[in-house]
Structures are given as structure tokens and as C-alpha cells.
């Protein structure tokens, strides 16, 4: 099996580090991974590791092969952990994590971060994503209409939380106010968090705040509301299996380097 780890020509440190860890992990399994800054039309790898969907779109038309997408993870610390999934971003990827055991959750994440359900917050939180981001690339986003619909559907104030990295990409969304604090503070005080498919849904579910999401790329798609019909009385499903499954989407660099991640992901080829 031939596996290539693609990094951009500028060789960003996080991409190179992920590629080196992945190649080290493959070596533990008797496989060789090659790091490359170029993927041509005659490329013959069976699998290409790429960081981010921009690189995936660069590579896939040329290689016509599967890709394994490395990205920021879902449970914190998102900059320490790396998510690894086949052929898609977030919930569009394949992680082979359905009905996972709870060992990874208990080992790494069962530290009190999963709070009891508490749908009694003082406002509805609308979290914005970056305009043009890959996660909403094919979704018809109209945040102003969504804010208007929310205000009609609830007596609670609707607060808008802009994306912390790039603010203002959607202009000024008219609602009942804005939330300028951290996402952790924002979801803790909300009755419901409303998002297209952002990771604020994960933060919210962990905080015990129900979520409305509108796109199946969301990592809380299976346990969140899909529309506004239950906004005033949200369901409170068991989150145990969701937490166990999500723990099998992300890996520490050292787990990748010793082959633990590939031990799980290689089942695609068995």
C-alpha cells in the first residue's frame, strides 16, 4: 500500500508535524509514508493524507484517490489534538467510530466537561461561522433571516456570537444583542445554541445546552434539533454514546506517531 502525506510548498509547521507523526505511525505497521509537496496527475498513491479541505481540493482531482483529512479536533484542546477522517470534513468524513467503546472518552475526556442538561438559560445563542468557510461552503446561509425566525419563535432574547477568529464577515446581524465573551461563557448561559454546523455545537452539548443545527456536517447532528419546532421544549437525549464516538475521531500526535491512530483507521482496508 502506497501512502503519501501532502504538505503545502510553504511547509507549514503544523502540517509537517502531522505528516511526520503519521509516517512514523505507519512505520510501526510495516508501511512507508512519503511526505511530498507535489501531487501530479500521474500520482499512484492509494491514500493521501492532507491537512484541511483546501489542500484536499488541490490534491484529489490530481490523485483521484482517497484522502485522509487531518484537521483541528472537536474536544479541547483543539490545537493539541488532530482529527483524522476519510474523504470529508467534520461529519461528512468517515471515522469508523459508530458505536465506539468508551475507553478513549474515559481515558482522555471524562474530566467533568460533560455537564448535566440545563435548558434554562436566559437567551437563545446564534453562533456565526466565517463567510466562505469550507464547513458551510455548500449551505445557503442567511443569518439575518435565521435571526428573524428565531425572534418570532421564542420570547427569549436572541444574542449573536460572532466567530472569534474572523469577525464581521456577515456584516451587522440585527437581533436582540451580541455576546462578546468566550464561547464557553456564551453556551453556558444559553437556553439553546443555534448553529449551521460549527463546533460551538460540540461546546454547547458538553455544557448541557441543547443545540439546533441545520447541516449534517455538524458533529452533533445525531443528538441535536434540526429545526426550530422544539425550541421552547428541546429534547434532552442521552449523550453517552455520542461522547464515546466523538472520542474516536481525534488523536494526540504521540498516538499517531506510535501507530495507534492507524491501528483504528486501517480497518477501511481490511
Regions found by a protein language model. Name each.
Residues 37-62, 66-71, 192-196:
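Short, well-ordered secondary-structure micro-motifs within conserved domains or adaptor modules
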Residues 7-11, 144-180:
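Catalytic donor nucleotide-activated moiety binding site of glycosyltransferases and closely related
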Residues 81-122, 137, 221-270:
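Leloir-type glycosyltransferase catalytic cores
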Residues 53, 180-225:
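A donor-sugar binding/catalytic signature common to diverse glycosyltransferases
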Residues 5-9, 70-74, 121-133, 161-164, ...:
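Short loop/turn segments at strand-loop or loop-helix junctions that form parts
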Residues 1-47, 132-133, 267-270:
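N-terminal pre-catalytic "stem/leader" segment of glycosyltransferase-like enzymes
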Residues 54-85, 144-145, 206-220:
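A short, gly/pro- and small-residue-rich
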Residues 16-22, 140-153:
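Well-ordered, non-membrane alpha-helical segments in soluble/globular domains
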